[in-house]
Amino acid sequence: MAIISSRPSGAEGEPAKSRTAPAEPAQRSRTAVQSERAHEDQHEESLRPKNLVDYAGQKDLKAVLGIAVAAAKSRGESLDHLLFYGPPGLGKTSISLILAREMNVQIHLTTAPALERPRDIAGLLVKLRRGDILFIDEIHRLPRLTEEILYPAMEDYRLDITIGKGQNARITSVPLPRFTLIGATTRVGALSSPLRDRFGLIQRLRFYDVEELAGIIVRNAALLNISIDEPGAAEIARRARGTPRIANRLLKRVRDYAQVEGDGRITEPVACAALELFEVDPRGLDWTDRRLLATLIEHYNGGPVGVESLAAATGEDTQTIEEVYEPYLMQIGYLLRTARGRMASPAAYRHLGYAPPQRFEQVSLLDSIDSAHGRN
């Protein structure tokens, strides 16, 4: 399998770097840090599972994709077009790379922001060979003209090119080989219906449970030559927000702490101490998560409040709140999205050390009445 990437640097499909990650410990020399990071980069690709068997978690998704791969191989055809959606960091890119290996085809990686002009997507399409996979991350951000070029490409395997302008314009069709388009998005509802309906298989990636993440951490620790015991892996997993990408990032930061403050081995006490230092609490909330909830409670009496007001008060943009912070806070029951706006749940109050107000039953009743009468 060959991987052909046209991603801009820092694209979402790449492992995310924490904007609030603490600086490297002062005791470690710059040379040591640079050497370690170079070694780490060599292992980055090796952390990705190579096939569906090695891919941890997402049991239902693996079963569906396993059938799709086996059926396509038996018929000698390419995979149908696929759309993966879910919060960032759950493995949408990794599973696409695995599908390319399973089908023994090339995969071309790009992101929607890199396809600003119609000729950008046209240039990728004409390079495809039979069976190739074209992976577009953040596909909900495709420009309208670019999206319209994909319609005949996905449905009829042809590229329609407009030659000339005005009354002299004419359309020339270029045949394309049968290929597979894989789209990845954190906002499936933002896709237009014509584009979404052209995907033959639409699958949601869910958050991972602690056991699944602990298994990923143990596996990746072995690949990175990190000594870790099961309680240590479980502690990191509990604070990883159900996300493998975050689990891998925390593993490396705890590794740093263990090397500087301990004997290099990650145990449960070492993991707890390290993650407290990095301000990741036992539920996986970092400083920004807690600030978001605290702002909701202190400035807006727990809500309900619109996301625009919450964004203005915290200095975050609405898209970041909706795509990065809200999914996990809602998953663990700390944030409620009602017809009236965002609300902090009683569990969020207790987690931050506040006494929950006595109004939740009344608000819940009002929302139920609104819902019954079709009000938004």
Swiss-Prot record:
Binding site for Mg(2+): 93
Cell location: Cytoplasm
Biological process terms in GO annotation: DNA recombination; DNA repair
Cysteines joined through disulfide linkages: none
Binding of ATP, residues: 47-48, 89, 92-94, 155-157, 198, 208, 245
Entry protein name: Holliday junction branch migration complex subunit RuvB
Gene3D superfamilies from the UniProt entry: 1.10.8.60, P-loop containing nucleotide triphosphate hydrolases, Winged helix-like DNA-binding domain superfamily/Winged helix DNA-binding domain
Region (Small ATPAse domain (RuvB-S)): 209-279
Ranges of Basic and acidic residues composition bias in the record: 36-48
Matching SUPFAM superfamilies: P-loop containing nucleoside triphosphate hydrolases (SSF52540), Winged helix' DNA-binding domain (SSF46785)
Self-association and partners: Homohexamer. Forms an RuvA(8)-RuvB(12)-Holliday junction (HJ) complex. HJ DNA is sandwiched between 2 RuvA tetramers; dsDNA enters through RuvA and exits via RuvB. An RuvB hexamer assembles on each DNA strand where it exits the tetramer. Each RuvB hexamer is contacted by two RuvA subunits (via domain III) on 2 adjacent RuvB subunits; this complex drives branch migration. In the full resolvosome a probable DNA-RuvA(4)-RuvB(12)-RuvC(2) complex forms which resolves the HJ.
Organism of origin: Gloeobacter violaceus (strain ATCC 29082 / PCC 7421)
Record has Lipid metabolism as a keyword: no
Broad EC category: hydrolase
Record EC number: 3.6.4.-
Keyword DNA-binding: yes
Domain observations: Has 3 domains, the large (RuvB-L) and small ATPase (RuvB-S) domains and the C-terminal head (RuvB-H) domain. The head domain binds DNA, while the ATPase domains jointly bind ATP, ADP or are empty depending on the state of the subunit in the translocation cycle. During a single DNA translocation step the structure of each domain remains the same, but their relative positions change.
Disordered: annotated span: 1-51
Record: residues binding DNA: 337, 342
Single Gene Ontology MF annotation: ATP binding
Reported function: The RuvA-RuvB-RuvC complex processes Holliday junction (HJ) DNA during genetic recombination and DNA repair, while the RuvA-RuvB complex plays an important role in the rescue of blocked DNA replication forks via replication fork reversal (RFR). RuvA specifically binds to HJ cruciform DNA, conferring on it an open structure. The RuvB hexamer acts as an ATP-dependent pump, pulling dsDNA into and through the RuvAB complex. RuvB forms 2 homohexamers on either side of HJ DNA bound by 1 or 2 RuvA tetramers; 4 subunits per hexamer contact DNA at a time.
Residue span of region Head domain (RuvB-H): 282-376
Catalytic activities: ATP + H2O = ADP + phosphate + H(+)
Gene Ontology CC annotation, any one: cytoplasm
InterPro entries: AAA+_ATPase (IPR003593), AAA_lid_4 (IPR041445), DNA_helicase_Holl-junc_RuvB (IPR004605), P-loop_NTPase (IPR027417), RuvB-like_N (IPR008824), RuvB_C (IPR008823), WH-like_DNA-bd_sf (IPR036388), WH_DNA-bd_sf (IPR036390)
Entry keyword set: ATP-binding, Cytoplasm, DNA damage, DNA recombination, DNA repair, DNA-binding, Hydrolase, Nucleotide-binding
